[in-house]
Structure formats: C-alpha cells, structure tokens
C-alpha cells in the first residue's frame, strides 16, 4: 500500500524538557488496521510498531475500548515512546470545529472525539528510562501550551494533584506502560503496568485537558493530530 509521508518539524525545545518530549509523532490511524494487517476475513488483534505490540481492544473496568490511533515518538535515531489512543466507541472524529458539542466539557474548537461519551485511555509505552519529574513536567507543559492563562489557572489545583500522582509513579523503566484513563462518573486514573497509582482526579474536563496535549489547538503538528483522530494516514520521519 502506498503511504503518504509527512516530515515532522523540529521541536521548539530540547527533547528531554517538558512538552518537547511529547512532540514529533509518527502516526497511523486505527481504521486502516484491517487493510494493513488483515488476511482475508481475519482482522488483526494487535498492531506492532517499533517492536511494541498494542492490542486493538482492551478491557477497562467493565468497558471495552478500541484502538483509535497509535504513534511512535522519536527524535532522530532515538525512539522515545509509543502512544496508543483508545475510545469506547471507535468513531473517526474530524479535527474541524463545526461539530456541535454534546459534552459540556468540550470546547467548540475541540475535535468530535471529545464529544463522544464513555471511557477512554491513553497508553504510553516507554522506550527509554524516565524520571517522575520528566513525566510530570511533560504533562504539565503540554496542558499549559493548549489552554489560555485563565483556564490553565483554573486547572492548576488538579494539575498539582496529577504531579503528585506522577511522583507516586516514580521513575519508569524502558518497556513500562503508562496508562492515563478516564472512567465515567469517577475521573482520571493513572496506572503503571496496570497498577493504579495515587488518587482518581475528578472531572471529564480535566481528562480532556490532558487529551489536548496531542489533540488541542497547539498539538505537536496539525497533520499528526488529524492522523491520531483517524482522518488520514501519516507516516513521518525525522
């Protein structure tokens, strides 16, 4: 199959500082998986990227989530992590702003995926060792980059709680899987290798703030944002 190729722009910061760690993704939308990986009527049960296997569906506290998109984050020859985005309903959202939101937590400029109710998961499979400080700084700066000053200030108390949770996670070794889950009626839960860490942080709006790190108004790249949303096939190199 012929793929479109996208060359990522350089990150604005050094790769190991804050939000720069979350930039420059290589993404393939999950809706192409049957075409890429199926044989006959057999649909693949997992995808492989950078020697990492991501299941195409995962159970989460009674919910069944489907892989919506996945990506490899790297800098030159260095592979940093694989990311997988899971949703309860694997609908393919558009990055346009003309979709009427049924979720009060979503902003008018948010993609349609934000208005889809239900559980969600972001999985980061680390390909290098990282400290709790590196992880928390990356999440904090990614949220700050995608919210105005007033909204960021309003989120700050819960961001501080997220930083505390990440301290509980501690240093994460290469190969570890960091899950950031949204549980309806509960909130955001962080787990390392399926072991929950810290408290659950309430509010769907807070989970959407985390999703905006990759899918907000200042994503790593707009083409990659659309690819993670399933709007097109983008395989990038840097």
Question: What residue spans do the PLM features occupy?
Answer:
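N-terminal secretory signal peptides that target proteins for export/translocation
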Residues: 1-22
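N-terminal secretory signal peptides
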Residues: 45-115
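Flexible glycine-rich active-site/ligand-binding loops centered on an Asp-His dyad
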Residues: 199-222
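Cysteine/selenocysteine-centered motifs that mediate thiol-based redox chemistry or coordinate metal-sulfur cofactors
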Residues: 222-238
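Mid-length scaffold segments of soluble, non-membrane domains
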Residues: 91-185
